[in-house]
Regions:
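Hydrophobic alpha-helical segments and their helix-loop junctions in multi-pass secondary transporters
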Residues: 108-111, 115, 147, 163-189, ...
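Membrane-water interface regions at transmembrane-helix termini and the short interhelical loops
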Residues: 49, 81, 120-123, 141-161, ...
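Membrane-interface loop-to-helix entry segments
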Residues: 133, 146-176, 346-359
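Membrane helical hairpin/interfacial module
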Residues: 40-132
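Membrane-interface "cap" regions at the ends of multi-pass membrane proteins
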Residues: 1-44, 51-53, 219-220, 366-399
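Hydrophobic, membrane-embedded alpha-helices of multi-pass small-molecule transporters
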Residues: 21-43, 58, 62, 66-69, ...
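Extracellular/periplasmic helix-loop-helix junctions in multi-pass membrane proteins
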Residues: 310-317, 331-352
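Membrane-interface interhelical connector segments
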Residues: 251-280
Length: 399
């Protein structure tokens, strides 16, 4: 009796969703609900000090500039057949390691002000008496743990920030709204252009955070409409920040330049607090968690870059050494905050323009990937017969 053999057809493999490094939705959430958190500490008072009622103008220019940078990187990602980081490695080869080294140093440099701001914020918000020398040291334990995690962990944190950020933001804005006077923002363009330019320059370290999205975009398996989602997320975060700045100045007016750590103060003027107590602190706690995630983000990138350069998987050791060094730095240099801030936001401002605005745009000049001439490996031979029952690859017929 003739025996007929059926050859199975091999299905084309597809990337599993659960194995993706990060999704466009998570990057959009990071842009909308994670990046704005750090702008609620010192940025409002700095903009108010230099630009007065026109504090929104330099902020808008910052957001437009960062949006152009993000659009450039997204366009490069859309033209790449693989995640942008793989394309960069294939083009640059070993030359990619100096790029990693430069950005590891930049992310470490850009984390200095957020670290010092976070320390002062914690002391001002949560300590009624003078804190001990190591009170802020707990943060570095948290940071050392977070820095050992990969891109997936950042995506999960972004998902959490949807609730940790948006609900407290709306609640605190509502508490302050009854005491605001938006006429304090008038007249529009009433500040001299030189002062607005000064506000733009001094606030550059606080608004040059679009670069924090670039490692996420570089690891994204780009699909259609991913760019629109990410840009929409960044735009939504920008609108929330602009609204907060308007509420802040409408609340404090000419005194806004002296009011530091804005989001812990705007809720204090809610009339019902005398009856229900300081419920505004509950929302401040939630925003503080988002602030911790944000502060850890550049340190996490630095850890990943150092491990890549050294070709080691000992992230725990690298993270521990990095955070120990930062703890020592904060302990010894926090008393020189004003000097460090004036240096970074003054003479060292071009560092942010170079690494956050100029270098990322260079990905537009990456050569395109050549088209593969190889035939698909998973294509079944023409003579293969499809079995009647799926998975039935046994012999047909009896003996």
């Amino acid at each position: 009796m003739q025996i007929t053999h059926y050859l199975p057809t091999t299905p084309v493999s597809k990337p599993l969703t659960k194995n993706k490094q990060i999704s466009a939705r998570q990057i959009a959430f990071a842009a909308a609900f994670l990046l704005p958190a750090a702008k609620f500490l010192e940025a409002p008072s700095i903009l108010s000090k230099h630009a007065g009622g026109d504090l929104l103008l330099p902020a808008i220019v910052h957001f437009l500039l960062q949006t152009l940078v993000i659009l450039a990187v997204l366009y490069a990602a859309s033209q790449s057949k693989t995640p942008l980081i793989h394309h960069l490695k294939s083009v640059a080869g070993k030359a990619v390691y100096p790029v990693y080294a430069l950005y590891a140093l930049y992310f470490l440099f850009s984390a200095i002000l957020p670290l010092l701001d976070a320390e002062k914020f914690v002391y001002a918000a949560y300590f009624d008496t003078a804190p001990t020398l190591f009170s802020f040291g707990v943060f570095f334990l948290f940071s050392a743990f977070v820095c050992t995690k990969g891109i997936k962990a950042i995506g999960r944190c972004a998902d959490l920030c949807l609730f940790l950020f948006l609900i407290p933001f709306l609640a605190l804005s509502f508490m302050a709204f009854s005491q605001t006077d938006f006429s304090r923002l008038l007249p529009l363009f009433g500040t001299r252009l030189a002062k607005s330019a000064s506000a733009f320059t001094h606030s550059t370290p606080h608004f040059s955070d679009g670069v924090l999205l670039l490692p996420l975009i570089a690891n994204l398996e780009y699909k259609e409409k991913d760019g629109a989602k990410i840009v929409a997320g960044y735009g939504f975060g920008a609108l929330l920040t602009l609204f907060f700045l308007a509420v802040f100045y409408a609340l404090f007016g000419s005194l806004a330049g002296r009011e530091h750590y804005a989001f812990i103060k705007i809720g204090q003027y809610f009339p019902a607090l005398s009856v229900v107590g300081r419920i505004d602190l509950v929302f401040v706690y939630f925003l503080s968690v988002v602030l911790l995630f944000y502060t850890c983000l550049p340190l996490q990138y630095t850890t990943q870059a150092v491990c890549t350069i050294l070709k080691t998987e000992r992230k725990t050791l690298v993270s521990a050494l990095l955070n120990l060094a930062l703890l020592v730095f904060v302990l010894f240099f926090n008393r020189h905050y004003n000097t460090i801030y004036n240096l970074i936001s003054g003479k060292l401002t071009p560092v942010f323009w170079l690494f956050a605005n100029i270098f990322p745009v260079l990905v537009l000049f990456l050569p395109k990937q050549p088209k593969s001439k190889q035939k698909p490996q998973n294509t079944p031979p023409r003579y293969a017969l499809k079995p009647k029952n799926r998975g039935d690859y046994t012999q047909k017929g009896g003996r």
